[in-house]
Amino acid sequence: MKHPFQIIVADTTGRYLFTTVKNVLLVIDLTSGKLVGQWKDELDNSDFLKKKYEEKFDKENDSKRQKSESGQAKVSKIPTPGPGAPPIYNYIRALRLSSDEKYLFATTDSDKAVVIFTIDHSKDNCLELKKRQPFSKRPCALSVDEDRLVVADKFGDVYSIAIEDDQVVNEKELTPILGHVSMLSDVAIVSNDKKKFIITGDRDEHIRISNYPKSFVIKNFLFGHHEFVSCLHVPNFDQSLLISGGGDDYLCLWRWYEGQLVAKIELRELIAPFLTDSHLPPERFLTETSPKEISVARILTFTNKKTGLNILVVLCEQTKAVLLFEIDAKLSVRHLQTISYEDNVLDMCYIEATNTLISAHDSDKNQLFQQQKFDEETNNFTPTTETMDAVAELNPIDVNSRNDFLPLYYINTLRKRSEH
C-alpha cells in the first residue's frame, strides 16, 4: 500500500500540483499526469544530532572539562535517545509557493530547517535546491513578503530571511522579529493602506497583529478563541478580513485592522456526524461528559466568477467531510454544502482557474487523491468522472501497513489539558 500524501498545493494555473509524502517532495503535471519534479530529504537524524553535539563539545574549554581520578580529561559522549524518548520524524511539515510561483518553500523536521527551491519547468527535474537554512527551534509555519520568507517556530519566535540570498546563516546568528510566550501555529503577512502587518496565532488562543517589519510594535490582539488557533486565512477577495480557526467549535470572521469580530461560524452541528471516538480526549483526560473535539486543519476561500459570491471551504482534522459556506456582501455566513468522502481528508487545495477542489486522503485502497468541480450555477461541488489514481501511483513511498505511516493527525495535540 502507499503512504498517504500529507500536504497539497497547486499553482494558479492548475497545471502543477506540489505535494509531500513522508520526506519526499513531488511536483506533478496534472495535464500530462507525469512527475516533473522530485526532492528527497536524505538527511539522517542521527548524523544531524551527532554533528550538533560535536560542535558543542569542540567549543568546550579543556580546562573546564571534568577530570577523572587519573587526571585525564573525560571525553563527553554523544547522547542517544533513551527508551520512551519521543521519536524525531523525518518529514515535511509545511509547504508554500512564493507569490510569483518561482520558488517553493518547505520545512524539514529532521534538522529544524527551511529549504528553498527554485522552480524551472524547462528542466527534467523542475526543483533545484537553493538553500537549506537551519533554525534553533523547529519551524512550523511560513508566509511570504515579496522577497522575504517569514518563518514561525514552535518556540514562539518569528524570523524573516531573504529568499534570493544563497548564503546559509548560522542559526545562532538569526534574530527573531517578534516572539510569543506560546508555541506558534500560523503566520500571515497582510497590508492595510499600503502599510504592512504580521498576524500570528498560537497555542494559547492568541491572535496578535503587529507592525511589519518593525514587529516589536503591537497594533492589537484579537480575542474570540478559547482554544488554540491553528489556521489564519486572509481571503484574496477582501484582505481586510481574517478567518481564524483551531480547537473551538467555530471559526471567527474578523475585520483584523479594526480588531472587530464580525461573526462566529458554528461548526459542531455540521461536522458532528463525522466525528468518531478518535476525536475524544486521551484516556487519562476522558470523562463521561467529554465532548468529541474539533480541530480545524485547513481554511480556503474563493469567488464564484459567474455570480461574484464568496465561498468558504473548511476542513476539520480526521474527518471524512469538507464544509462549504457562502459569505455575502454584509458578511453574513450561510452553510451551502457538506461534501462527504469515503476516507478521511488530510489536506485540500482549490484551483480557481479550473474550479477544482483537490483533496488528499488517508486511504487503504490507494485512492489518495479525489477531485470535485464547482458548479457556478448551484454553488455546489460535484465529483468528477476523472480519477486521479494514475497520479497517486507516482507516490514513491510503499509501506507494509498503517503502522508504517508517519503521524497524520497532530493538530489536536495543540490542545492544552488540565491535570486537575
UniProtKB/Swiss-Prot annotation:
Biased composition regions of type Basic and acidic residues, renumbered to the chain: 59-68
Matching SUPFAM superfamilies: WD40 repeat-like
Record keywords, A-Z: Nucleus, Repeat, tRNA processing, WD repeat
WD repeats: 87-127, 179-220, 224-266, 340-379
Pathway linked to the protein: tRNA modification; N(7)-methylguanine-tRNA biosynthesis
Subcellular location: Nucleus
GO CC aspect terms: cytosol; nucleus; tRNA (m7G46) methyltransferase complex
Residue span of region Disordered: 59-82
InterPro entries, alphabetized: Trm82 (IPR028884), WD40/YVTN_repeat-like_dom_sf (IPR015943), WD40_repeat_dom_sf (IPR036322), WD40_rpt (IPR001680)
Pfam families named in the record: WD40
Sections of the chain in a coiled coil: none
Matching SMART domains: WD40 (SM00320)
Annotated GO biological process: tRNA (guanine-N7)-methylation
GO molecular function: enzyme activator activity
Predominant location category: nucleus
Function: Required for the formation of N(7)-methylguanine at position 46 (m7G46) in tRNA. In the complex, it is required to stabilize and induce conformational changes of the catalytic subunit.
Family: Belongs to the WD repeat TRM82 family.
Assembly, per entry: Forms a heterodimer with the catalytic subunit TRM8.
Protein name: tRNA (guanine-N(7)-)-methyltransferase non-catalytic subunit TRM82
